[in-house]
């Protein structure tokens, strides 16, 4: 018989970035430690995860179906739309290193002038690799996804209008973890491991 408690709903979520090699939390309830930056509010669409595989099929003479398959590679993507405009999101969206940005402080004047951030972008900007953490939250239920090394593989269009926030749609692609570890680690609360 089904159990409604096993239905997981992503009521809210958080996403964090840090330099590659930053220590991940050791449990789903542990706080994100030093070095992790909260990327702020996300669109109500939540997070979209996609998994893909590229397989080789071995055919045998006289057989209609493949007799064996082998996975050549697996990949995943995590798409999130962020609502806040922060230096970290500008870096990820425009592929700009923090060291290539300049923050000019506000001037009280006269004349007064606001603080502003300046940077340039080029067509061949280097990718920005980062460690990525995602929490999907429903009350005390948490699914925590920890990606040791991720790159932004796709960016949605930015719309500026009076009807909506000027958001940042980013698709993150996990890359091979440093030192050969797991590319993606997960903690999921309240899921029982069934033994045969």
Q: What would you call each of these model-derived segments?
A:
Residues 1-196:
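Signature of extracytoplasmic/envelope-associated structural regions
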